[in-house]
Amino acid sequence: MKFTVERDILTDAVSWAARSLSPRPPVPVLSGLLITAEAGVVSIASFDYETSARLEIEADVETAGQVLVSGRLLNDIVRSLPQAQVTVELDGGKVLVTCRSSRFSLATMPVGDYPALPELPAPAGTVDGAAFAHAVAQVTVAASKDDTLPILTAVKVEIEGDTITFLATDRYRLAMKEIRWTPADPSISTSLLIKARTLTEVAKSLGSGGDLEILLGQTADLVGFASGGRRTTSVLVDGEYPKIRSLFPESSPIQAVVDTAALVEASRRVALVAERNTALRMVFTEGQVTLDAGTGDDASANESVPCTLE
């Protein structure tokens, strides 16, 4: 195998694929990136039994072939290279990476030991990447970080026709966000449980590339996302998610409009005196909301932020 490609193109591709690598892979080969060179195209893939990532880049392929090398080491190497063309070549049991006068030699891992990548599910529709990323950012903050309750580390994604609803809770907070999308089947009706960290990673790495394609399999254990030639899959979380939609009121008799940045900053300051897992109180009156924390002889704090009651 031997191919040549611009440094920035290779760096971007390797960096994206390496983001899916587990810091503690269950088997050594899963720390590697699978690189396949064919006529004019190089594909790079990673897999950890839960998530997979794959993409293709154009390259000058002199000799076709396939190798498996340490993803994190290759990522560190290509990021350090100067702005010039990079040649990647298999030489015996080593992979040589050459850029101008820089030359690196990497050990390979047995390609035959690498598990087969999951088949990509069929395209189910497209959604605006920016809207998807914004919704994910708003909802995942309410997902649990406690792995002893894996069901709550997931976000429930409900799809009904042209509407996608994201729901999350950690038992203390609730979050829900609806966005529109363009389904291939207008009558689609399904729900998925996707790990919050998976959605966050998809939003970061694929949400800025225009339209985001959502891929749904025939079985209920895999979901995929694709944008700009990059494709990723994730195993779904199994279990019964709490029925939290009904906890959101149909309407609210009173609404308060407040500057987001001012409320966040005030909350951070007042929370400095709050003990762990204690409440920060919010009192709404005409023209302001007062934040209060701490009681008795302990430290206390309060701050008011302008607001409009509707």
Curated annotation (Swiss-Prot):
Q: What is its main location?
A: cytoplasm
Q: Which domain of life is it from?
A: Bacteria
> Which keywords annotate this record?
Cytoplasm, DNA replication, DNA-binding, DNA-directed DNA polymerase, Nucleotidyltransferase, Transferase
Is DNA-binding found in the keyword set? yes
A cellular component term, taken from the record's GO annotations: cytoplasm
Q: Name one GO biological process term.
A: DNA strand elongation involved in DNA replication
The Gene Ontology terms for molecular function here are: 3'-5' exonuclease activity; DNA binding; DNA-directed DNA polymerase activity
Subcellular location per the Swiss-Prot or TrEMBL entry? Cytoplasm
On subunit structure and binding partners, the annotation says:
Forms a ring-shaped head-to-tail homodimer around DNA which binds and tethers DNA polymerases and other proteins to the DNA. The DNA replisome complex has a single clamp-loading complex (3 tau and 1 each of delta, delta', psi and chi subunits) which binds 3 Pol III cores (1 core on the leading strand and 2 on the lagging strand) each with a beta sliding clamp dimer. Additional proteins in the replisome are other copies of gamma, psi and chi, Ssb, DNA helicase and RNA primase.
Q: Which family does it belong to?
A: Belongs to the beta sliding clamp family.
Listed PANTHER family: BETA SLIDING CLAMP, DNA POLYMERASE III SUBUNIT BETA
Q: What does this protein do?
A: Confers DNA tethering and processivity to DNA polymerases and other proteins. Acts as a clamp, forming a ring around DNA (a reaction catalyzed by the clamp-loading complex) which diffuses in an ATP-independent manner freely and bidirectionally along dsDNA. Initially characterized for its ability to contact the catalytic subunit of DNA polymerase III (Pol III), a complex, multichain enzyme responsible for most of the replicative synthesis in bacteria; Pol III exhibits 3'-5' exonuclease proofreading activity.
Q: Please state what the protein is called.
A: Beta sliding clamp
Q: Gene name on record?
A: dnaN
